[in-house]
Curated annotation (Swiss-Prot):
Cofactor(s) listed: Fe(2+); Zn(2+); Mn(2+)
Native organism taxonomy: Eukaryota, Metazoa, Chordata, Craniata, Vertebrata
Binding-site positions, a divalent metal cation 2: D39, N84, H174, H226
Chain segments annotated as transmembrane: none
Inhibition and activation profile: Active in presence of diverse metals including Fe(2+), Zn(2+), Mn(2+). Also activated by Ca(2+). Binds two metal cations in two adjacent alpha and beta metal-binding pockets.
Keyword Ubl conjugation assigned: no
Organism this protein belongs to: Xenopus tropicalis
Gene name per UniProt: dbr1
Family recorded in the similarity comment: Belongs to the lariat debranching enzyme family.
Function field: Cleaves the 2'-5' phosphodiester linkage at the branch point of excised lariat intron RNA and converts them into linear molecules that can be subsequently degraded, thereby facilitating ribonucleotide turnover. Linked to its role in pre-mRNA processing mechanism, may also participate in retrovirus replication and have an antiviral cell-intrinsic defense function.
Disordered as annotated region, ranges: 388-457, 470-534
Gene Ontology BP, a term: mRNA processing
Protein name: Lariat debranching enzyme
GO molecular function annotations of the record: metal ion binding; RNA lariat debranching enzyme activity
InterPro entries for this protein: Calcineurin-like_PHP_ApaH (IPR004843), DBR1_C (IPR007708), Dbr1_N (IPR041816), Metallo-depent_PP-like (IPR029052)
Polar residues: compositionally biased ranges: 413-424
């Protein structure tokens, strides 16, 4: 089946769906599934915007609320993970995953699902070492600190994913696995993003947690975003089992949805034609969730996961066939994920904006039902219970410096002509001074992007299909990995009905008939400096 993979969404759902539909018509093909690698921005109303780690002057409603309200329906089944620019309060309602809108599914803090027999896993957020061992203690309204820590990866999710033993077809993370750039062409990467050089040379770029998962899970495909550049790599894993064929992972990072950027790619993935055309639970993952329910931490205190070091009576929480059968019984032998989306808050009304709306802590019925069926802990219900009983010590003051104060209506205006911009057009400034120990990118993000274009009127070129082989050139080779992808896919033909495959970019200078012209609504958001670390 054909899977469309998208990098950073940044709320551009309409543009992404329109692009796919245009390409389906142009190429006479059908995309079966869309995967988004973070920064999805499922913003339902003004309160959600205040829970997104973006400066107030750059916040814009976008159009997700139309999918949430039912005014629009996602034309393609969409699965996404969270990034570092999200409506964290909404995603927090669904820690184990769930429908954020009809036909749009969030994986959760971490999760595994199946579609047509293809096993798809993912982990949300980005890595920051100072929050890694904490629990999920944050709750809205967030403070200036918790609005960022809410999307930081926790060790419980990594520990759970490391219990998996069955083969993984696709895995998604927002930030890159650390060291993956050594398996692709670093020369071309640094030509595009020279401010990564020191971190690449020091091997500090990317997430060590994701790198750990890559070595353990060894999926066939790994997709990421976050760094706003397309990069392909091929990693051959090692095996200690004699006679066993080593696994290999095709890694692909994609850009964000902007003009002249490679933000979308079609991947042909083998599937089981006998499997139903719906999302299904993964029994092994559910068994791991149930086995590890007592390891949950809802405070900001640090918490170590069990290890085989003589200090823990149990450290292996992997799923046995018996536990998977028990899970199947709990589900009534129906592993189809129910389409039980429900609205949990009022939707944005452009005719009656509520700028003083503040996000509240909500327990989502989807999570309640899921936990009841499997005997799991509803994190939000547990936090609320402890708050009501007065026996929870969050230690991080959610009320002090709350970002949920009333704001002037002008902050949501689409007129951005007066906004100041930095010399780097790529990024969104978070305006904080958090430490840079994990990724250390902020001081270099002031450099201009070599491929930026300010054009606002665009249409689209054709799409590239990821080839079966992603041979990686050395740093000294003339052609990079991406160049080889170009050569394998861009053979131009002249006969009628033939297709010319070129990188998918949102172009400003293509005016052929049949193109879809799209005008940017929020260009100024991406003309400001972004502290990617947060």
């Amino acid at each position: 089946m054909k899977i469309a993979v998208e990098g950073c969404c940044h709320g551009e759902l309409d543009k992404i769906y329109e692009t796919i539909q245009f390409l389906e018509k142009k190429e006479n093909t059908k995309v079966d599934l869309l995967l988004c690698c973070g920064d999805f921005q499922a913003v339902r109303n003004e309160g959600d915007m205040k829970c997104m780690a973006v400066p107030q002057k750059y916040r814009q409603m976008q159009t997700f609320y139309k999918y949430y309200s039912g005014e629009k329906l996602a034309p393609i089944l969409t699965i996404f993970i969270g990034g570092n620019h999200e409506a964290s309060n909404y995603l927090q309602e669904l820690p184990y995953g769930g429908w954020v809108a009809p036909n749009i599914y969030y994986v959760g803090y971490a999760g595994v699902v199946k579609y047509r027999g293809v096993r798809i896993g993912g982990i949300s957020g980005i890595f920051k070492s100072h929050d890694y061992r904490k629990g999920h203690f944050e709750r809205p309204p967030y403070s200036k600190d918790t609005v960022r820590s809410a999307y930081h990866v926790r060790n419980i999710e990594v520990f759970r994913l490391k219990q998996l033993k069955e083969p993984m077809d696709i895995f998604m993370s927002h930030d890159w696995p650390r060291s993956i750039y050594h398996y692709g062409n670093k020369k071309q990467l640094l030509k595009k993003k020279d401010f990564f050089r020191q971190e690449v040379e020091n091997n500090t770029l990317g997430s060590p947690a994701a790198s750990e998962l890559l070595l353990h899970i060894q999926p066939s495909y790994w997709f990421s975003a976050h760094l706003h550049v397309k990069f392909a790599a091929f990693m051959q894993h090692q095996t200690n089992v004699e006679g066993e064929i080593p696994k290999a992972t095709k890694f692909l990072a994609l850009d964000k949805c902007l003009p002249h950027r490679e933000f979308l790619q079609i991947v042909d993935v083998e599937h089981d034609p006998g499997k139903p055309d719906c999302l299904e639970y993964d029994l092994e993952w559910l068994a791991v969730l149930k086995a590890t329910k007592d390891l949950l931490n809802i405070t900001s205190k640090t918490w170590n996961m069990p290890e085989n070091n003589g200090l823990h009576s149990r450290w292996d929480f992997s799923a046995s066939e018996k536990t998977k059968r028990e899970i199947l019984d709990d589900l009534g032998h129906d592993i189809k994920i129910p389409c039980n989306f429900c609205m949990t808050t009022a939707c944005y009304d452009p005719n009656n904006p509520q700028y003083k709306r503040v996000a509240t802590h909500i327990v989502n019925p989807q999570t309640t039902e899921f936990c009841a069926r499997l005997g799991l802990v509803d994190l939000n219900a547990k936090i609320r219970q402890h708050e009501e009983e007065g026996d929870i010590d969050i230690t991080e003051d959610n009320e002090a410096d709350s970002i949920g104060s009333a704001e002037d209506p002008g902050e949501y205006s689409t007129d951005t002509s007066l906004l100041s911009t930095s010399i780097n057009p790529d990024e969104i400034a978070l305006e904080d001074d958090d430490d840079q120990e994990d990724e250390g990118m902020a001081e270099k993000l002031g450099e201009p992007s070599p491929d930026y274009t300010p054009d606002l009127s665009i249409n689209f070129s054709n799409i590239r299909v990821l080839p079966d082989s992603m041979a990686v050139s050395s740093d000294d080779a003339t052609d990079s990995t991406n160049d080889e992808l170009d050569r394998s896919e861009s053979s131009q033909t002249e006969g009628e009905g033939k297709q010319s495959n070129r990188p998918l970019k949102r172009m400003s200078n293509e005016n052929g008939s049949g193109g879809v012209k799209i005008k940017r609504r929020n260009q100024a958001i991406y003309q400001a400096k972004d502290d990617e670390d947060e």
